[in-house]
Amino acid sequence: MRIEMKNISKAFNGNPVLKNAQFMIETGEVHALMGENGAGKSTLMKILTGVYKRDGGTITIDGQERTFKNAKEAEEYGIAFIHQELNILPNLTVAENMFLGKELMYGKTGILRTRQMNAIAQQQLAELGLHVKGAMLAGELSVGQQQIIEIAKALMTNASVIIMDEPTAALTDREIETLFTVINKLRKEGVSFVYISHRMEEIFSICDAITILRDGEYVGKRSIPETSFDEVVSMMVGRSIGERYPERNSQISDVIFEMRNGTKKGKFENVSFQVRKGEILGVAGLMGAGRTDIMKSIFGYEPLDSGQIFINGQEVKIDSPIDAIRQRIAFITEDRKSEGLVLDFSIRENLALPNLESLSKGSVLSNELEQQFTADMMKLLNVKASSGEQAVKSLSGGNQQKVVIAKWLGIHPQLLILDEPTRGVDVGAKKEIYSIMNKLTEEGDAVIMVSSELPEVLGMSDRVLVIHEGKVGGILEKDEASQESIMALATGGE
């Protein structure tokens, strides 16, 4: 299937989002669609699949002009869209999610062919390297496993074109390798992939070509063998952003945080490590190793069953997030939309949530203090929005992440825990988040950064804590850390 989109325009409430955008993909091609958050990538694909109606321009498929009325019509034609936000119903089984709307039944009885659906689901997932029971509840799976279910659902529609919006954001390196194997197999069979991602290494590894949008406009198209990382970044942001990871200039001094023999039954055991003032401690490991569980215990979401926590040399009890906040510990979770933000609230309201005490006069929330705090934080973190009253659900991924970080900066954290801080964030916003981390450590605070992106771990960390199956696999100094040494420890080696 060959698709060509020409001069596509779209505005929301009079604000242009796409201006004469273009995109073309050939049969069997893996084509990256890149641009900063808010560049119009997802909007362009939603126009292709009938989610949005275009204001202008043409779409031709195999030489015939076409317009889809809705996503179902596009899917029936052979175009599937796997969105960044997972479309998984946690209370349904794996098989029920995969067959939703396409259930197998015994004739017209309405009775489901459950055993057959379970078997097909298991087979499809096994081909993607995921071995789970079709009868298992989807909510019991990790985010990465749920992402693979989404991919399998798209493959089950016999799609000729599969649009993937940040498909690997929650996948481990092994799962990504499995996905790429599947993509390479399908491209040989004539299936095309639109690959929306901010992960440069992946794009240069799996894609044939790149189309770049900036501020809703078409910037250009490049063949992968004929371009470079620097050229793509420059085309995306309209300028050179310099080194990918900013230089670290902080002075590392005394131990600010220590966990001794921390244990949470069924999650992790006998975990011991320290973090020092001015330090960024990277935390690496395979998905399900227990990295996030350890961070949740530090913040009091899931208190330790046994073990000790020390802050500045003093033992403290952290049995709830309130206890953690009193110790000036902040935690930015991996799932900003369900755990880090109230999407229907404004930027101002989200920023105020953990800072009600400092923004109040007496027992009354001060509108003046709230407005000033919002303005200061938006300026400090370069949050791009019309005003502090804009709903966070309407912000790009990068700006949403900045709001999450901003609200916690209000407590002046001495320890900031970041779980997958740049997931789904464009290269420009990533650089800004890295700069915020550096600024905190230069002021003598400490950062723990959990990340599945090994280049990020290596580029930003002073030391790397590697977790393997709920235990400390090892701790690497900066000059010892490499992708190979981290993966060796993460998989149980030495």
UniProtKB/Swiss-Prot annotation:
GO terms for molecular function: ABC-type D-ribose transporter activity; ATP binding; ATP hydrolysis activity. One of its GO terms (cellular component) is plasma membrane. It holds the Pfam family ABC_tran. It is a peripheral membrane protein. Signal peptide: none annotated. The complex is composed of an ATP-binding protein (RbsA), two transmembrane proteins (RbsC) and a solute-binding protein (RbsB). This is Ribose import ATP-binding protein RbsA. The gene is rbsA. ATP binds at G35, E36, N37, G38, A39, G40, K41, S42. It is an enzyme of class 7 (translocase).
